[in-house]
Amino acid sequence: DGETLHENAASNDRLLDIFLSAKQVEGCTTPTIKYYGSTIRQLFKKMPKKITDYTTEDIRAYLAVFQRKNKSSKVTIDNIRRIFSSFFAWLEEEDYIVKSPVRRIHKVKTGTQVKEVLSDENIEQLRDSCTKIRDLAIIDLLASTGMRVGELVLLNRDDISFDERECIVFGKGDKERMVYFDARTKIHLQNYLDSRTDNNEALFVSLKAPYNRMKIGGIELRLREMGKRLNIEKVHPHKFRRTLATVAIDKGMPIEQLQKLLGHQRIDTTLQYAMVKQSNVKIAHRKYIG
C-alpha cells in the first residue's frame, strides 16, 4: 500500500545518503557521487521495495529491461552493475542486509573494441594544417604528454618548467602528477607564450580579447574542425592520449610506468591498452595468416 511504499522510500533514501557520504569520505569526486546517486535512485523508482527485499532476480531483471529500453552498450550495463555491487556490498558490510543480491551477477563481458588511434602521419598533417601558433602548441602538448583535456585547460603558465620539459597536472580526484613533453613542444609552447599580449595566468586562452581561459568544449571543437578539413576520422583530445599509450606499450614501456604517466588510479585501466595491443595482434594474424 501507499504508506508502506512511502516508508520504504524514506528508509532507502536514508541508506543511500549514508552510502554516498561514505563514498565522499573515501575520496570519490562529486561527479562520481552524483552518478552513483542517480543510478541507484533509478532502481528505487522502477522497483520500489525495501532494501532488504531486493533479490538477485530483481537486479537481473532491472538490468535486462534497462538495456532493452535504452539500447545501452555492454559497458554502460556493466557500470550500473558495478555501482549496484558497490552499494549492496556496503550494505552487507554495514549489516543492513544479510547478503548482497548482486554477488551472483557476473561482470558483463564487454569484448575489447580496438579503438582508433592517430597515425604519425595524421599527427603531422594536423601540425602542418595549424594556422594559429596556439593550436600547434595544444596539439604538441596533447601528443607528447598524453594528458587529459580536462587537465590541459586547468594548466597555468607557472605549471610549466621549460628547463626540465615537464609540467604538473591536476588529474581526476585532485591528484597531482608530473608529465613530460618533447623538445618540439617546448619550442612551440615558448613561441606561443612569447606571442601573447594578455596577462591571463592560463596556459591556453581564446584567440580574441578578453582572452579567457579555454574550455574543454572549445578545444574539442577546434580539433574536430581541423580533423574534418583533413578528412581524418574523429579527431578529439582523448585520441592523442590513447595514441601515446599505445605507442608506449608498442615500444615496451613497463605498464606501471605508463600507469604513472597517464595518472590511472587502477592498473586495470592501463592494462586495457595492453589488451588492445594483443587484440591488434590477433586481427593482424587473421588478416595475414588466417
Q: For each predicted feature, which ranges?
A:
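Catalytic-site neighborhood detector that most strongly recognizes the C-terminal catalytic loop/helix
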Residues: 117, 172-173, 262, 266-287
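N-terminal core-binding DNA-recognition domain of tyrosine recombinases/integrases
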Residues: 2-6, 14-114
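Basic, Lys/Arg- and aromatic-enriched nucleic-acid-binding interface segment
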Residues: 97, 112, 120-149, 173-175
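Alpha-helix N-cap/helix-start motif at helix boundaries, enriched for small hydrophobics
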Residues: 33, 84, 138-139, 146, ...
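Short pre-functional
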Residues: 41, 85, 136-150, 166-167, ...
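Conserved tyrosine-mediated DNA breakage-rejoining catalytic core shared by Y-recombinases
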Residues: 145, 150, 154-191
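Active-site/catalytic core of tyrosine-dependent DNA strand-transfer enzymes
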Residues: 182-232
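C-terminal catalytic core of tyrosine-transesterase DNA break-rejoin enzymes
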Residues: 140, 144, 241-265
